[in-house]
Amino acid sequence: HTTIQAAVDAAIIKRTNKRQYIAVMPGEYQGTVYVPAAPGGITLYGTGEKPIDVKIGLSLDGGMSPADWRHDVNPRGKYMPGKPAWYMYDSCQSKRSDSIGVLCSAVFWSQNNGLQLQNLTIENTLGDSVDAGNHPAVALRTDGDQVQINNVNILGRQNTFFVTNSGVQNRLETNRQPRTLVTNSYIEGDVDIVSGRGAVVFDNTEFRVVNSRTQQEAYVFAPATLSNIYYGFLAVNSRFNASGDGVAQLGRSLDVDANTNGQVVIRDSAINEGFNTAKPWGDAVISNRPFAGNTGSVDDSDEIQRNLNDTNYNRMWEYNNRGVGSKVVAEAKK
């Protein structure tokens, strides 16, 4: 196959429940890749010595018009009726809104349960070509369950990695939470770098804040965890790096609706001096709900009691971290 999308289409057309493996030769592959829902899982792996040897990239802005998006995403009829990924493309190209929005700004989008990615780079190359305003530019979006990502670079600026629970209608759902494991990887961006409603474990992964576009506060995590679900994002044995002194925050809740209370835990990780130790967590995006930490109360036995899922408080935690940015400083009482 001459394109990654053609290889994906061929694998999906087999309609088998057996895993299909796609080896990607070193090179730069410009354009989107859509992996549809299918009976079996798909594995894409780069055959180079390192992840940067295989680079999948395109410049897409969530603020662009559907017409401009169609021009950039579907040259020469890459997506056509009858092809496996047509339903994914059509859910975005048929929009009647002024802009395509964050969910359709992804360079690599998968709805495949059991997707595996290894040893490659996925980048939304919009980068610093736009101003500091709202410019969602997703590099990787996954909707499927039991996704595994290992030794992958995920590069962008705003909403670099978006983990949703959308169904085939391309809308957020309230009855399922897809699971993802990310290991030995590198994720880069500025605003709400990792966002969405999925449950994700990050192990031995580096998060790097690049604020050359915004020149202001940046945010690593923006979980949109449903309030009745206890687990969102977990980062363990990982590294958080930002340039400057206290310019970044670890995250904030992505309050997409009234049933959202983002959940994230960062533990056993290194956090550098680029993070705001006085206020490591920000106010919620969209709702502007002020951050409220849950310190609990002391009972008659001098034991601290607290409901970790109390909707009156945020669910964002740090445990056993190290580095200058890991020191939590209590704000003065008002």
Where are these regions (language model features)?
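Sequence-level preference for short, compositionally simple segments enriched
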Residues: 1-334
